[in-house]
Amino acid sequence: MNVYYEKDADLAYLQGKKIAVLGYGSQGHAHSLNLHESGLNVRVGLRPESASCAKAREAGLEVTSVAEATKWADIVMVLLPDQNQKAVYEAEIAPNLEPGNTLAFGHGFNIHYKQIVPASSVNVIMIAPKSPGHLVRRTYTEGNGVPCLIAVHQDPTGEAKQQALAWAKALGGTKAGVIETNFKNETETDLFGEQAVLCGGSAELIKAGFETLVEAGYPEELAYFECMHELKLIVDLYYEGGLSRMNYSVSDTAEYGGMTRGPRLITPAVKAEMKKILEEVQDGRFAKEFIDECNGGYQNLSKLRESNSNHAIEKVGAKLRNMMSWLIKK
């Protein structure tokens, strides 16, 4: 894969351009402020009733409606929730785009699954920092940055890749490294990781471990500590140095037990189910299911949220976290 750094990106491809960032959430605030402080001409596009309008203005940014920001801009970055992007695009973005404009995204979902199909006269790019927005912002203010992905979907002007690299540089990303990919690979790996490992797999593993201990007669408090609370300690070791760092850092007892018992849990049958989940991402079945869920008023998701919130691990966890001074907001 191609990896780019400071010397490979030139802010000149954005200087003199009018840039609209649509959304001011986790990523939106980081993109807006980092580009603004990199000397670029940035406006934020929001719904007039959005509570984020005041926050953006307090940060020194100019705020207008989504339609006005798009009409004004040469480059439009869409950082709205996936499920909202299609409707906003059709109503407020598409009518205000002109040939030669650039449409940018932080995630490939709507382009890859053809929920949004821009005119062929418009550049379509992606700049995706591989961290939460607060870390994108913090590392920038410290003079550093986080690794980013870039991709080009359409390039009628011949400058799409250079614009994506310049954007990543303005975020601070070229100080860490910018990896070139495509919308398909970014979208499919992102969704699979969320479903099979990060959000789906890990949550179910935690609940199953907690339930196993409680059903065997152990106190809920101990089950919580062993199956939920201490997970952060292990994940931090993975994050800092991979599997080897974790195995080096834990006791020999933990290392041996994990290496000999772990494969009994994550069996070939589990991996086969992972492949099925990946296939549903690849062929669009998950995307269709999620879009239908959103259009239907989140009925299934609402039930799942309620079930999760009522799980015993949530109740004992809330009680135990009150004992942890570092978690109590002052």
Curated annotation (Swiss-Prot):
Instruction: Report the record's Gene Ontology biological process terms.
Output: isoleucine biosynthetic process; L-valine biosynthetic process
Residues where NADP(+) binds = 24-27, 47, 50, 52, 82-85, 133
- Give the superkingdom in one word: Bacteria
Can you quote the record's cofactor note?
Answer: Binds 2 magnesium ions per subunit.
The UniProt entry annotates the active site at 107
Q: Which GO terms describe its cellular component?
A: cytosol
Function, as annotated, reads: Involved in the biosynthesis of branched-chain amino acids (BCAA). Catalyzes an alkyl-migration followed by a ketol-acid reduction of (S)-2-acetolactate (S2AL) to yield (R)-2,3-dihydroxy-isovalerate. In the isomerase reaction, S2AL is rearranged via a Mg-dependent methyl migration to produce 3-hydroxy-3-methyl-2-ketobutyrate (HMKB). In the reductase reaction, this 2-ketoacid undergoes a metal-dependent reduction by NADPH to yield (R)-2,3-dihydroxy-isovalerate.
The name this protein carries in UniProt is Ketol-acid reductoisomerase (NADP(+))
Give the originating organism: Chlorobium chlorochromatii (strain CaD3)
